[in-house]
């Protein structure tokens, strides 16, 4: 699970069980401290930063071990069982919970506000998937509860603030199913492919999630499986499940007065992300600390990365990328660029617009995808509009536990950033409370991260109109040799891409145009890598990490500055 303004916090929380089991008067701040609940959209709310995963998380490659893993069907209108679950000591705070979460999951149009900021969500979970699949997948969620679990929150959530080894998500799901199994009607429709298994069980548990504002005893949102032949609903077995929290760590935006402590219902982004795991998609962010690098992932441009928190905290999550649509076999118009020509992109992939592809001539599984991002409909949460270019090093049998970006400096799916830096959320600087004015400094760091995202796409905030090997942009290279046997300046391990883009522009209404160059080296003539290269004084390490422009802070070593190797002694 990725984060909004994200940083994995390493500080342990030593708060009382009472505070953690939240009367929801306190939420977990980025530094691990429990603080009063802020108002949605306030400056203080920016300091409540969700976490990607517990510090001790070790993924399991479920399908690599079991090739017959049953993923949730992703076509048609399968019925998904949703259980609203109270803990023994923490109850639902959302008004009209069954109706509110029916809207959350199933509303066909605008969501009505039932008193908990319900209409902050741009649409329902079902609407999201209908839009991003172009109508091929429109799940229907059957809502039951709230039911009462037999144990306190601590039993399921444990007491550790920074890892999940003391949590019991399977027990939570098992107990929820045992409470609801005699209530469920039309059991057969919960098994759309008639394989004897309920397609998926989604449990919404009361209160906050530890991944986003909850204390040490709260539960992490997650997706996993249960292997228990005795656990059934009717004659149907249970396997796939996802769980997520009831509440978002903020008070509603429009309060009656300062004494109004009405909590905000959760955003749909985490639910869309976790449910996508149940359908087989992996996390796109790295899960190993050695890969917590800039230019290593997709950040806010992908639901399976930070995009689950797009739209001010996940209220307008990013649609699937073209790569993800392709994995699901959903309609996506991907066209290979081969001949030099001028191209126009008028629509997003969600609207059926073309997605262009540039492929390594010697490796069909290595390519770049070009998508038009227009800040309309489900793309309203995007950081900017323009041409999104991302590198893909594809592989067979994509699975939930693959972690494609865990190899440092060699991501399988990562942004090609127009401004030379797709900043990792792991790299956001955190000022400690011992520093003067630390709160304001941290807000500035978070704003800086969000502002930097705007430069990832073309032309972006830096007005970058070209993409070629002279531009020395990270991730614009081949891992294996393409049609020229020359290594890149930024990273001597990888090869130059001989294809290029020129005259990239975007109109006010979001239309992207560019010229595709099939043989950049021939079109520019024989030249050294520095010919026509812009001197921008950007500093990179030899493995392509961007370090800014201040040479005074450099340690001893070799760096790339203005496309040349510079030795600092």
Regions found by a protein language model. Give the residues of each.
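Zymogen propeptides/activation segments of proteases
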Residues: 3-4, 16-242, 351-522
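Alpha/beta-hydrolase fold active-site loops
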Residues: 79-80, 267, 556
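Exposed beta-strand face motif in extracellular beta-rich ectodomains
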Residues: 277, 499, 557
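Bacterial N-terminal signal peptides
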Residues: 7-13
């Amino acid at each position: 699970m990725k984060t909004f303004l994200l940083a994995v916090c390493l500080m342990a929380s030593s708060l009382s069980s009472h505070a953690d089991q939240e009367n929801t008067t306190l939420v977990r701040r980025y530094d691990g401290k429990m603080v009063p609940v802020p108002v949605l959209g306030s400056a203080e709310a920016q300091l409540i930063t969700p976490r990607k995963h517990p510090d001790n998380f070790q993924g399991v490659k479920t399908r690599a071990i079991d090739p017959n893993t049953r993923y949730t069907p992703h076509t048609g209108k399968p019925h998904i069982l949703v259980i609203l679950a109270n803990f023994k000591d923490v109850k639902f705070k959302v008004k009209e919970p069954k109706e509110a979460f029916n809207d959350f999951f199933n509303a066909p149009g605008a969501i009505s506000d039932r008193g908990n900021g319900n209409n902050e969500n741009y649409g329902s979970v079902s609407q999201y998937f209908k839009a991003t699949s172009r109508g091929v997948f429109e799940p229907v969620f059957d809502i039951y509860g709230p039911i009462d679990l037999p144990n306190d929150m601590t039993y399921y959530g444990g007491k550790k603030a920074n890892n999940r080894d003391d949590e019991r998500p399977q027990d939570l799901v098992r107990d929820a199913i045992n409470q609801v199994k005699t209530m469920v009607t039309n059991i057969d429709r919960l098994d759309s492919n008639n394989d004897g298994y309920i397609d998926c069980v989604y449990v919404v548990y009361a209160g906050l999630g530890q991944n986003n504002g909850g204390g040490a005893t709260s539960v992490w949102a997650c997706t996993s499986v249960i292997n228990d032949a005795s656990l059934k609903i009717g004659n149907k077995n249970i396997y796939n499940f996802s769980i997520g929290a009831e509440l978002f760590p903020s008070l509603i935006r429009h309060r009656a007065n300062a004494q109004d402590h009405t909590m905000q219902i959760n955003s749909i982004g985490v639910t869309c992300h976790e449910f996508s795991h149940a359908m087989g998609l992996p996390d796109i962010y790295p899960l190993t600390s050695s890969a917590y690098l800039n230019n290593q992932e997709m950040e806010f441009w992908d639901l399976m990365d930070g995009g689950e928190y797009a739209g001010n905290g996940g209220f307008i999550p990013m649609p699937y990328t073209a790569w993800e649509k392709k994995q699901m076999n959903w309609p996506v118009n991907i066209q290979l660029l081969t001949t030099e020509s001028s191209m126009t992109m008028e629509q997003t992939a969600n609207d059926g617009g073309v997605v262009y592809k540039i492929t390594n001539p010697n490796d069909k599984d290595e390519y770049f995808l070009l998508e038009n991002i227009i800040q309309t409909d489900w793309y309203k949460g995007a950081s900017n509009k323009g041409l999104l270019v991302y590198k893909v090093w594809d592989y067979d049998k994509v699975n939930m536990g693959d972690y494609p970006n865990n190899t440092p400096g060699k991501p399988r799916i990562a942004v090609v950033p127009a401004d030379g830096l797709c900043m990792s959320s792991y790299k956001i600087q955190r000022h400690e409370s011992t520093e003067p004015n630390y709160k304001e400094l941290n807000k500035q760091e978070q704003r800086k991260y969000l502002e930097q995202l705007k430069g990832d796409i073309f032309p972006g905030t830096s007005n970058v109109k070209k993409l070629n090997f002279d531009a020395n942009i990270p991730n614009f290279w081949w891992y294996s040799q393409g049609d020229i046997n020359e290594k890149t300046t930024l990273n001597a391990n990888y090869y130059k891409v001989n294809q290029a883009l020129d005259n990239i522009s975007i109109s006010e209404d979001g239309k992207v145009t560019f010229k595709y160059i099939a043989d950049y080296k021939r079109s520019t003539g024989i030249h050294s890598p520095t010919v026509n290269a812009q001197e921008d004084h950007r500093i990179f390490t030899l493995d392509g990490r961007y370090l800014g422009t201040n040479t005074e802070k450099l340690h001893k070593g070799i760096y790339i500055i203005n496309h040349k190797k510079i030795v600092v002694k």
